[in-house]
């Protein structure tokens, strides 16, 4: 029992800074929306539309680079720290290549926006302008993630937290300058949010790069040679590990976007209630997601040390802590669902529906915690392909069709409306949790030689 308590302490020490960093990142999006809304409703809507396209694109790149964390953790655990700098250099090359792709997609996103049904031309122009300003921040964001993944792979999660809040503090005044046109800058409205956020991402990267260069704990792996030429073998391996994670993130984000589109014809009350419950659930999701990042680090490090038993201990402890967190957040959600809904909207019908949906959200929080931590465990074992197949099957083959049938048809029961889609979420997330656990058990039952061979690739 003592080893599990010790492991839990180490996991929480890693996870808490990640949680706070994620809160800072979420707060940046909140600040953009509120400040754009203070300028005009049209600008706020433009930022919301632009963000709905930006997020899937940038999360694809973010997911691709998550492969660095278990690679660096494993090298650190095995004492091969001299190889880390080369992996990081290749991570920067990969980030640069993906940035070009993302920037191309975002530059041409106007075709998607203008094809939206009955969208106002002025709103479409502002959304396109916002994206074309924001896309210049894509390289800065992804370069920041490379440096952050280097730190987190070495079990240094506090720098990401500190620089995340630095970015938030810089974002507010820079937003104000570009939205309203102060200090000689043009008055850009919602487009100014894109300019400000792009600039902030570069500030965050420069700050993180400066920390990495000066940190005493990284002197032995400092990147003295600068940028070496691309190593196709290393980049190919990073893509093989990262692409399934990137696709899983992409399909997860697009799932919720598709459900939002399917709910939209049901009426304003249904849309508002669904959005409130979804937004609150997303905030609660920060906890298991951050714990999953910590579990990836610990499992990768233990495998690098050559101890499959300690890796199992880290995995089991992560799951135990995650379930305890989920039970607490579920009780919190059930107990305070109506006051929470009132914080978003005071319409009685909206509050009633949101409170009902939050009951369903409380049910799936345990499954959600297990599946996302299971994903973190599999990343630590470098078994990322299974993450994609499990996620795609659970969400798109089981969850979404089930939700559609329950919400919009009479095939099984009378039409349930938004609650049907939330039942679909429960089915999908529970299926994902079961499949993640089965895959984890399959991997852990393999011989130590096979597990360590895979981890060393």
UniProtKB/Swiss-Prot annotation:
First-listed, main subcellular location of the protein, grouped into a coarse class: membrane
Compartment(s) where it occurs, according to its Swiss-Prot or TrEMBL record: Cell inner membrane
Single GO MF descriptor: antiporter activity
Record GO biological process: sodium ion transport; xenobiotic transmembrane transport
Assigned keywords, A-Z: Antiport, Cell inner membrane, Cell membrane, Ion transport, Membrane, Sodium, Sodium transport, Transmembrane, Transmembrane helix, Transport
Bilayer topology: Multi-pass membrane protein
Superkingdom: Bacteria
One protein family per Pfam: MatE
InterPro entries: MATE_fam, MATE_MdtK, MdtK-like, Multidrug-R_MdtK
Transmembrane segments annotated in the record for this chain: 11-31, 53-73, 93-113, 127-147, 160-180, 188-208, 243-263, 276-296, 314-334, 357-377, 387-407, 418-438
Gene this chain is encoded by: mdtK
Stored NCBIfam families: matE
Function, as annotated: Multidrug efflux pump that functions probably as a Na(+)/drug antiporter.
Record-stated family: Belongs to the multi antimicrobial extrusion (MATE) (TC 2.A.66.1) family. MdtK subfamily.
GO cellular component, one term: plasma membrane
Keyword presence, Cell membrane: yes
Record protein name field: Multidrug resistance protein MdtK
């Amino acid at each position: 029992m003592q080893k599990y308590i010790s492991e839990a302490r180490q996991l929480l020490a890693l996870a808490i800074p990640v949680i706070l960093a994620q809160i800072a990142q979420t707060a940046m999006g909140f600040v953009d929306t509120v400040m754009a809304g203070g300028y005009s409703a049209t600008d706020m809507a433009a930022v919301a539309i632009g963000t709905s396209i930006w997020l899937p694109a940038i999360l694809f790149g973010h997911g691709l680079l998550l492969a660095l964390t278990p690679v660096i953790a494993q090298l650190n655990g095995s004492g091969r720290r001299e190889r880390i700098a080369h992996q990081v250099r290749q991570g920067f090359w990969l980030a640069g290549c993906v940035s070009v792709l993302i920037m191309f997609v975002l530059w041409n996103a106007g075709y998607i926006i203008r094809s939206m049904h009955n969208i106002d031309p002025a709103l479409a122009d502002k959304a396109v302008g916002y994206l074309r300003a924001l896309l210049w921040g894509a390289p800065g964001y992804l370069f920041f993630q490379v440096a952050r993944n280097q730190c987190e792979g070495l079990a240094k999660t506090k720098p990401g937290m500190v620089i995340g809040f630095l970015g938030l503090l810089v974002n507010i005044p820079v937003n104000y300058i570009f939205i309203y046109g102060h200090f000689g800058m043009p008055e850009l409205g919602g487009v100014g949010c894109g300019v400000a956020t792009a600039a902030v991402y570069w500030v965050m990267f420069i700050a993180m790069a400066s920390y990495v260069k000066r940190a005493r704990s990284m002197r032995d792996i400092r990147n003295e040679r600068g940028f070496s030429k691309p190593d196709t073998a290393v980049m190919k391996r990073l893509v093989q590990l990262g692409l399934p994670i990137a696709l899983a993130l992409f399909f997860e984000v697009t799932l919720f976007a598709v459900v939002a589109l399917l709910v939209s014809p049901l009426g304003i009350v249904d849309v508002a209630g669904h959005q409130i419950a979804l937004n609150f659930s997303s905030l609660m999701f920060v906890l298991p997601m951050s714990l999953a990042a910590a579990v990836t680090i610990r499992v990768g490090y233990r495998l690098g040390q050559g101890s499959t038993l300690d890796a199992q201990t880290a995995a089991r402890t992560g799951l135990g802590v995650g379930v305890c967190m989920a039970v607490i957040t579920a009780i919190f959600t059930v107990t305070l669902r109506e006051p929470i809904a009132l914080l978003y909207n005071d319409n009685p019908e909206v509050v009633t529906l949101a409170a009902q949906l939050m009951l369903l959200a409380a049910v799936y929080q345990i499954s959600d915690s297990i599946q996302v931590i299971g994903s973190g465990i599999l990343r630590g074992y470098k078994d990322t392909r299974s993450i994609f197949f499990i996620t795609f099957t659970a969400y798109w083959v089981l969850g979404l069709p089930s939700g559609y049938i329950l919400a919009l048809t009479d095939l099984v029961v009378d039409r349930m409306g938004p609650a049907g889609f939330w039942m679909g979420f429960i089915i999908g997330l529970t299926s994902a949790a079961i499949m993640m656990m089965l895959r984890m058990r399959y991997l852990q039952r393999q011989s130590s030689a096979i597990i360590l061979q895979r981890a060393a690739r």
